[in-house]
């Protein structure tokens, strides 16, 4: 009997390689414990641009732009077992990955 109907996991990171590595680790763990996985679904990458002056005093026209991209992935774990939940709790992911977990029941 399933503990919950569905677990939704959203992953965010600045580096897409670490994000994909974490995603495959979660998918492998869920499949190994007998759960069905939908995804990973790549969500749109958000891009933030910051413009600063190059000089502290003069040259207002001389500016520099910095960009940071936030990559996102979505995973749905359908019909998770108790083993799946325990394995996901013990999973050690890299420090640069933000994980949001939501559980949906009946």
Curated annotation (Swiss-Prot):
The keyword Manganese appears for this protein: no
Physiological role: Involved in the binding of tRNA to the ribosomes.
One function term, GO molecular function aspect: structural constituent of ribosome
Record's protein name: Small ribosomal subunit protein uS10
One GO CC term, this protein: ribonucleoprotein complex
Assembly mode: Part of the 30S ribosomal subunit.
Residue runs in coiled coils: none
Keyword Ribosomal protein attributed: yes
Record key words, sorted: Ribonucleoprotein, Ribosomal protein
HAMAP family according to UniProt: Ribosomal_uS10
BP terms from Gene Ontology: translation
Annotated signal peptide: none
Membrane-spanning residues: none
Record family assignment: Belongs to the universal ribosomal protein uS10 family.
